[in-house]
């Protein structure tokens, strides 16, 4: 029993990217859009990936990457965001050698376009791309190659999910994406979402499979709830989406 507990404790340390773990993980927050940005690095090779950077906090991210002695290979987006402008474009200029990455189905510009099943490699690690459309057609979830953690974007939030009433969203598609691409991961796989509005930072597949108030419903009930949310549109959508279609590079003013 003691050995089993120790193995679990060691795995949890590894999953969280603590000082004794081979992978480095940092979770950062942008308060205006309540967006999480994730830095993952291989402590051995010093190669790193940044998930869902925000324009306003990209200089902060670049500074941290330099302080930690990492080399950023990719600035990746889980989808074309509507509530903030991505920092991918700025990071390409702040950290030469960094490439922007987004799903091909997003229709957005990037250095590299990915599809379901593609891997993003950094050092000894890789992020598996799992298409998880529904919030938008181009949404993806990034799963670490040992299935210890998943970065779910807006597809799956902690006790919630992304909305489906704009950007060609589809509630039925989202329901099946989460159940087939995320809930099939191990129960102790850590869930790291793109946003949280209630002070939470992380969940697990098992927690969301059993406790998520929307996604524990039937598909029919889920579709009905999502169709009756009547939420206001994101404040930045009119300029965030066009900018994000250009990798966060805004049109120069005359």
From Swiss-Prot:
Entry's Gene Ontology cellular component terms: cytoplasm; mitochondrial matrix; mitochondrion; nucleoplasm
Impact reported for residue 55 to P: In EE; reduces protein stability
The keyword Metal-binding is annotated on this UniProt entry: yes
Record-listed N6-acetyllysine modification sites: 66, 172
Transit peptide: 1-7
Signal peptide residues on this chain, from the entry's feature table: none
Keyword Cytoplasm: yes
Annotated TM spans: none
Protein's cellular compartments: Cytoplasm; Nucleus; Mitochondrion matrix
A GO MF label: identical protein binding
Swiss-Prot/TrEMBL cofactor(s): Fe(2+)
Entry binding sites for Fe cation: 79, 135, 154
EC number annotated for this UniProt entry: 1.13.11.18
Keywords annotated in UniProt: Acetylation, Cytoplasm, Dioxygenase, Disease variant, Iron, Metal-binding, Mitochondrion, Nucleus, Oxidoreductase, Phosphoprotein, Transit peptide
CDD domains reported in the protein's UniProt record: POD-like_MBL-fold
In-chain residues carrying the UniProt-annotated modification N6-succinyllysine: 172
Disease note: Ethylmalonic encephalopathy: Autosomal recessive disorder characterized by neurodevelopmental delay and regression, recurrent petechiae, acrocyanosis, diarrhea, leading to death in the first decade of life. It is also associated with persistent lactic acidemia and ethylmalonic and methylsuccinic aciduria.
Similarity field: Belongs to the metallo-beta-lactamase superfamily. Glyoxalase II family.
Described function: Sulfur dioxygenase that plays an essential role in hydrogen sulfide catabolism in the mitochondrial matrix. Hydrogen sulfide (H(2)S) is first oxidized by SQRDL, giving rise to cysteine persulfide residues. ETHE1 consumes molecular oxygen to catalyze the oxidation of the persulfide, once it has been transferred to a thiophilic acceptor, such as glutathione (R-SSH).
Protein name: Persulfide dioxygenase ETHE1, mitochondrial
Species annotation: Homo sapiens
Upper taxonomic lineage: Eukaryota, Metazoa, Chordata, Craniata, Vertebrata
